[in-house]
């Protein structure tokens, strides 16, 4: 049992029935925080393409943390995704990852559980690197990402304007196990020569 007396959250792939809850959770961040640079609330219909771009297998996943309810539907506590970093083909072995937790789930290990499940699911995929963009300041996200062996690699200064001010985004990088078919580029990076 968690400190709040509820059952441990269950982490699983997202399903279509989650879409309304996922959209509501995301809209909290759209309306109240600079964590996402979306500025207009989304609808479940408007998020359908996003949902469909995260199947249950492959390199682009959606993992959901849910809390079982004694009666009625489970309650969504958060979600994590891996998405294409960029649309060009050479970026295919890189993914951008994100995690969003319900505001009242802070401190319950939901983000850790989501990233654990996401990276376990991605372990067999042809992915070489994961990247995360984190609006600054965000100490909790920094701690989460460093716990998962991400390292800060740079900051886009004042890259987004929301709520009447500019925000920096720090980028984090994590090495993954896949992406081995590099045509020798890995050797060049490691030794400085081919």
Swiss-Prot record:
Q: Which Gene3D superfamilies match?
A: 3.40.630.30
Asked if the Swiss-Prot or TrEMBL record annotates the protein with the keyword Transport, the reply is: no
EC number(s) reported in the record: 2.3.1.-
Q: Does the keyword Coiled coil apply?
A: no
Q: Where is the N-acetyltransferase domain?
A: 9-173
Q: Which UniProt keywords apply?
A: Acyltransferase, Transferase
Entry-linked Pfam families: Acetyltransf_1
Q: Which GO terms describe its molecular function?
A: acyltransferase activity, transferring groups other than amino-acyl groups
Q: Which family would the database say this protein is a member of?
A: Belongs to the acetyltransferase family. PAT/BAR subfamily.
- Annotated protein name in UniProt: N-acetyltransferase
Organism, by scientific name, is: Streptomyces griseus
